[in-house]
């Protein structure tokens, strides 16, 4: 093998940038740490951008996606063939590329974020690679990020689709290492498996209980803690904002994020008289929520930003008087961790106001103002408490404690804990 050939490879299969999703950021963060931990070839294998657009996923502006470090390659395999089954064609492209990466002689760790379809793609590629007779040295990690269970498996349980649920569990448990993004997610996995077992006499729950570990999402703390404060005022001024001068929502604009409750709660608060509300993000509910805001009693105090890049996001979080994510369970989505909440706590500024939905308590600990789900009046009270009744010294003390708690989710800490189990030869620099 030529000296220039890689010696250790990490492959991450995920919906990557420009998708607005915490797990696209997690993939980036794991990749960046891997380059410092002895992996000299890191591949993020994902979907072509037109496919992401066609799926209706919220996407960042392409020119706003930050570059990756040397040694990290983003691959977007083209579809295979021209028959009229688009999903199969693109899936075939991804599986085919993974087979090539698994059979070129480089020892590889392959990690999938989302079981459906990414863990399935990895499993299919490993089976093909080994059947080829070519040397194959692959260790697999499957990460259940939440919607795998809250959407796919739960639907299978509720609609008695045994085969679909069995496929997800079998694929998941067939990986070398199984992890979930929170204890809440693992509990959901076990609960769903128990429902399948009770109905069909299978034994998925016991295997999930024994084999699934917790690996929290990896977050680049430096992006939020090493903020250039000299730029803060200038960045905010371009948006017509000032430091400590607005309430912020920054996430995907969907029903499950509780933006409707935030708009109503803000309109009912006294804090509206002191600071405006900024809703930053894109998503399918944006038009309806813009209309809701326009019809509210404080329409002139609510602004929407749909073009925030990763760099500006940090400043918006740091400069906010309060950050609100009023998540609520929906059939299509439950907040299984709360990456944006951790990012806000790392950035500093005013307090986080959120709900105890899903895995959010694991993300925030005792460092957030918790309000009931779907309760705008409680949001109004929390905003008034945080903005009108808390001294600057109190807020600074709370912000420091929140940042200290959030550091456990730093990407280096998460990567090292995960790979201590997966690949003990990986040593911290």
Give the ranges of each region predicted by the language model.
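N-terminal subdomain of nucleotide-sugar transferases
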Residues: 1-63
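Nucleotide-activated donor-binding/catalytic signature segment of Leloir-type glycosyltransferases, i.e.
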Residues: 126, 244, 287-312, 322
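Donor nucleotide-sugar binding/catalytic pocket of nucleotide-sugar-dependent glycosyltransferases
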Residues: 139-142, 166-231
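Conserved donor-binding/catalytic core segment of Leloir-type glycosyltransferases
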Residues: 179, 214, 219-221, 241-267, ...
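A charged, aromatic-enriched C-terminal amphipathic alpha-helix characteristic of glycosyltransferases
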Residues: 223, 257, 393-423, 429
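Acidic donor-binding loop of glycosyltransferase active sites
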Residues: 318-333, 350
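Short hydrophobic beta-strand element within catalytic cores of glycosyltransferases
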Residues: 346-354
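Conserved acidic donor-binding segment of nucleotide-sugar-dependent glycosyltransferases
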Residues: 354, 366-377, 385-391
